């Protein structure tokens, strides 16, 4: 049982009296840390205890009690009861107070995520966790431990737009590498769901090129999707990894992603029949990876790539000619592909329904409209912001004792002294 000093009533009274100034909150935090083991062992602590606290005013104390009440084995009934309580707390709590015990807040939010997944209702957790991210973030540039969890719920709920709302900020501060890997991987999948393939490529690229001593499962899955999205969006596959990719990635990716590399090489050859035959042969592997839908989009994009090539050679073509040249079944299929490409802005063309002729046009965009100027200005401002972030990171590194110590040790290995020739001595051979 809890002693007189740490009785539940005494803790409640302390929470009510010490939830004001920063100094009081610091003292309260020390008290709660000392009392948490006793609170877990106290049978008198139950959800009705929370009625004595205001979640918005006493957020720190409320968090400690809520963590005690939600720990342990979970049944579906317990999960269903706890979800609204946790969600209400997340939505109403004070950001400044919960940041004092951010690890507990993260743990509570992960409990909520597990609860909604267990009940098969991931959408129920999306809103509260989006609020949790905003409250936990000190800066929009910082990646929190909750970013991957939000994106995971959005993927399971197919609420892609909600997930995309936290992908627009440029992240420059990261605590745990695993959070970054998952954030970029799940974020890439969110963008694929929205068909924002350029952004998906950026995020998957971050996973593929991230520093790693040995390849992890997240990076391997990201590379598979990176290949497929490259085919869909860029219409080509590059067999060589970016130079900034780690040695582990350079060495291992090709060994574990053979079917995808084979698919990319076949795509580059431009022979649709061979590509479709390869997809049939490797169908089970693509389906096991849950990438068959993307593979089919890649095959479809080869038709579009071949149609795009025709626009560079011809001014007019019949739909039947297009079907024959790109190996489509009939003129109707060719018309569907051309219309989709016009809608996506990939080509500019007019289809004459009377004679089935397609007239290819020049790009009407003259880059003079107010909308285009706004887009260009936005890109310039983002670039300026990134430049400032890089300068700030460089200055921070230059003052970091650990970094300076490492640089000093490395420099000593190659410091030969002033009396050593700077140019190697030449010998006649």
From Swiss-Prot:
Q: Name the SUPFAM superfamilies on file.
A: Winged helix' DNA-binding domain
Primary localization class, coarse: cytoplasm
A GO biological process this protein is involved in? positive regulation of G2/M transition of mitotic cell cycle
- Keywords carried by this UniProt record: Cytoplasm, Developmental protein, Nucleus, Phytochrome signaling pathway, Signalosome
Every copy of the PCI domain together lies at 196-365
Entry GO terms, CC: COP9 signalosome; cytoplasm
Q: Which domain of life is it from?
A: Eukaryota
Q: Which SMART domains match?
A: PINT
Recorded hits in Gene3D superfamilies, A to Z, give: 1.25.40.570
State where the protein is found.
Cytoplasm; Nucleus
Which proteins does it associate with, and in what oligomeric form?
Answer: Component of the CSN complex, probably composed of CSN1, CSN2, CSN3, CSN4, CSN5 (CSN5A or CSN5B), CSN6 (CSN6A or CSN6B), CSN7 and CSN8. In the CSN complex, it probably interacts directly with CSN1, CSN4, CSN6 and CSN8. Interacts with COP10.
According to its UniProt record, which protein family does this protein belong to?
Belongs to the CSN3 family.
The record describes the protein's role as: Component of the COP9 signalosome complex (CSN), a complex involved in various cellular and developmental processes such as photomorphogenesis and auxin and jasmonate responses. The CSN complex is an essential regulator of the ubiquitin (Ubl) conjugation pathway by mediating the deneddylation of the cullin subunits of SCF-type E3 ligase complexes, leading to decrease the Ubl ligase activity of SCF. It is involved in repression of photomorphogenesis in darkness by regulating the activity of COP1-containing Ubl ligase complexes.
Q: What is the protein name for this chain?
A: COP9 signalosome complex subunit 3
